[in-house]
């Protein structure tokens, strides 16, 4: 998947002065990705197997579907909470 970041050779690209904007966009894409994961896991049939990838490796281990679903929902909630905090900070900066 191609990255959405700018390359050093792109000198004509305008860089926003607000540091939270790139983080906010990154969070937004992670939230979309996590929503898809939750949706896919929740729509699986009961007899389907789910595998978890070992971090920094190409090894996959069998995982419990319900545990993976609840873990994915928790991650989604945390991402949404962090995104909301950034939104609130942006709103307070605008008011000042």
UniProtKB/Swiss-Prot annotation:
One of its GO terms (biological process) is protein stabilization. The keyword Disulfide bond does not apply. It is found in: Cytoplasm. This is ASNSD1 upstream open reading frame protein. Keywords: Coiled coil, Cytoplasm. Residues 1-10 have a biased composition (Basic and acidic residues). Its main location: cytoplasm. Component of the PAQosome complex which is responsible for the biogenesis of several protein complexes and which consists of R2TP complex members RUVBL1, RUVBL2, RPAP3 and PIH1D1, URI complex members PFDN2, PFDN6, PDRG1, UXT and URI1 as well as ASDURF, POLR2E and DNAAF10/WDR92. Residues 1-28 are annotated as: Disordered. One of its GO terms (cellular component) is cytoplasm. The keyword Translocase does not apply. The lineage of its organism: Eukaryota, Metazoa, Chordata, Craniata, Vertebrata. SUPFAM superfamilies: Prefoldin (SSF46579). Residues 23-96 form a coiled coil. Gene3D superfamilies: 1.10.287.370.
